[in-house]
Amino acid sequence: MALLNILQYPDERLHTVAKPVEQVDERIRKLVADMFETMYESRGIGLAATQVDVHERVVVMDLTEDRSEPRVFINPVIVEKDGETTYEEGCLSVPGIYDAVTRAERVKVEALNEKGEKFTLEADGLLAICVQHELDHLMGIVFVERLSQLKQGRIKTKLKKRQKHTI
């Protein structure tokens, strides 16, 4: 396994729309393992392949503290949405930035697991939010782009200042 580099917003590569995985093979399983290692090391709960500059429809997540419920979504598609909720989100590609985003309260998603087997998951709460957040990444959307133009501008300014101080 290997740690992967997580792209940082506003890197243009984060806006690349991911292509479907054609075959779930050893290459994809290695990517999944590397994504889990990277996500856990970064103390995240979800990671999309787009964030590590691999533009294929692969997502990993684990909402538990003890890393006991790893979930893999290959070629995920949300087939149903219901309700509305607002939750303060963060992102490994936008470190230190958190803001409230409105999303569906419940979702039904279809995907393949790391063995290439199709499954359906009905999710609510944080899991539903995380699924939508990570699937946005596969469409080239970063959560801050769901905020008002004013908030987006403030975040970009904050990130530019932070970048100047780290150089």
Curated annotation (Swiss-Prot):
Phylogenetic placement of the source organism: Bacteria, Pseudomonadati, Pseudomonadota, Betaproteobacteria, Neisseriales
Protein name, per record: Peptide deformylase
Keywords noted in UniProt: Hydrolase, Iron, Metal-binding, Protein biosynthesis
Catalytic activity as recorded in UniProt: N-terminal N-formyl-L-methionyl-[peptide] + H2O = N-terminal L-methionyl-[peptide] + formate
Protein family: Belongs to the polypeptide deformylase family.
General function of this protein: Removes the formyl group from the N-terminal Met of newly synthesized proteins. Requires at least a dipeptide for an efficient rate of reaction. N-terminal L-methionine is a prerequisite for activity but the enzyme has broad specificity at other positions.
Cofactor: Fe(2+)
Source organism (scientific name): Neisseria gonorrhoeae (strain ATCC 700825 / FA 1090)
Cofactor note: Binds 1 Fe(2+) ion.
UniProt keyword Ribosomal protein, yes or no: no
Keyword set includes RNA-binding: no
NCBIfam families: pept_deformyl, PRK00150.1-3
EC number: 3.5.1.88
InterPro entries attached to this UniProt entry: Peptide_deformylase, Peptide_deformylase_sf
UniProt-listed SUPFAM superfamilies: Peptide deformylase
